[in-house]
């Protein structure tokens, strides 16, 4: 069984120790958040399971790893994006007469069904991509990010319910931090930008530890 509380605590401590007093590292990571492949590349290094935050050197390698990690996410998201375009652009949804109440009701039902399908697909992609990214980092093999059988097997060892609940806990924490920042007038966006490195370190370490819980001892 996954100890989400312990993973949460360890991830906070990891992010705190990785940035506390290291203002040069913090500033470099803030800049890398703007050049997002760099930050993804840094998260890629955290995914490898290091016990301390990795050094922010070899920017070319980080950029390359970040691009590859982005491509993994894009490849998994592409079917959902294509399905969204196909379903919402279908003639039945576009060409509905506003004078026909039955047609309008049918349109509403169709939109609801399509939305449910897309939400389910997006959630499934998120669940798979999360483990796929860590697997890619651990094996250093791009093709392993698409080894669906092993990815599903790994999540099954963690336990699907534990896996989903743990990721939801991480998402809730990140949402709370974001909302607190955004409700602060004027300075909120600046504060959120300043906290992005902490949030990135926290979430990538959290996912890495969650992945470890499904690794055979």
For the regions a protein language model found, what residue spans apply to each?
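Interfacial aromatic "cap" segments that immediately flank transmembrane helices
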Residues: 5-31, 56-82, 128-178, 211, ...
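Short, small/hydrophobic-residue-rich motifs at membrane-helix boundaries and re-entrant hairpins
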Residues: 28-51, 60-61, 65-126
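Selective recognition of hydrophobic, aromatic-rich stretches within alpha-helical transmembrane segments
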Residues: 29-48, 106-145, 179-215
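Alpha-helical membrane-embedding segments
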Residues: 80-97, 169-187
């Amino acid at each position: 069984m996954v100890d989400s509380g312990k993973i949460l605590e360890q991830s906070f401590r990891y992010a705190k120790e990785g940035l506390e007093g290291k203002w040069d590292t913090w500033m470099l990571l803030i800049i890398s958040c703007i050049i997002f492949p760099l930050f993804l590349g840094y998260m890629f290094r955290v995914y490898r399971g290091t016990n301390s935050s990795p050094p922010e050197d070899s920017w070319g390698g980080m950029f390359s790893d970040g691009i590859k990690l982005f491509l993994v996410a894009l490849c998994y998201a592409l079917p959902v994006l294509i399905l969204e375009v196909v379903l919402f652009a279908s003639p039945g949804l576009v060409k509905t007469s506003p004078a026909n109440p039955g047609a309008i009701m049918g349109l509403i039902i169709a939109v609801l069904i399509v939305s449910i399908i897309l939400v389910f697909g997006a959630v499934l992609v998120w669940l798979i991509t999360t483990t796929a990214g860590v697997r890619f980092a651990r094996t250093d093999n791009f093709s392993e990010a698409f080894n669906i059988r092993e990815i599903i097997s790994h999540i099954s060892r963690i336990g699907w319910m534990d896996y989903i609940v743990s990721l939801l806990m991480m998402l809730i924490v990140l949402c709370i931090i974001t909302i607190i920042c955004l409700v602060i007038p004027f300075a909120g966006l600046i504060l959120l930008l300043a906290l992005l490195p902490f949030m990135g370190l926290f979430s990538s370490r959290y996912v890495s530890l969650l992945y470890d819980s499904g690794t055979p001892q």
